[in-house]
Amino acid sequence: MAAKVEPFWKRKTLDRLDAEEWESLCDGCGLCCLQKLEDEEDGSVYYTRIACRLLDLETCRCRDYANRRRSVPDCIQLTPAQAGEFQWLPPTCAYRLLAEGEDLPLWHPLVCGDPQAVHRERISRAGRMLSESAVAEDDWEEHLIFRAG
């Protein structure tokens, strides 16, 4: 009987993942592509339901992922070197969970095999976001949905 091999995210630290493994950790929720506001007093990060102009509001995927940083220069590219700073990511985010020593949730596509589970379980904001082009930046505070961390 062959020994059961643990999935890569249980066997490797974030800094040991190859590019394909790293990218596959993204569950496609799109939450990291929502506009965020930082409380100037305590540094808390609040997510809004205002999405980056490149985010498809239904699929929660970037419409130009390969070139996103050209179109949106302040788009944040997550790297293993930043793992200690992932507290601003949603508490359901695989990058944050693994950086904090947690496992992936049952609905994560790598666990259940279904990329639509993140939407069915309503982890993503599919269909419940607004494009940043539709809301004045001064009005973003009216669209807060949760606090990270």
From Swiss-Prot:
Q: Which residues form a coiled coil?
A: none
Put simply, this protein is called: UPF0260 protein Avin_32930
Q: Tell me the Pfam families matching this sequence.
A: CxxCxxCC
Question: What family is it from?
Answer: Belongs to the UPF0260 family.
Organism field: Azotobacter vinelandii (strain DJ / ATCC BAA-1303)
- Domain of life of the source: Bacteria
InterPro entries assigned to the protein according to its UniProt record, in alphabetical order: Puta_zinc/iron-chelating_dom, UCP006173
Q: Which HAMAP family match?
A: UPF0260
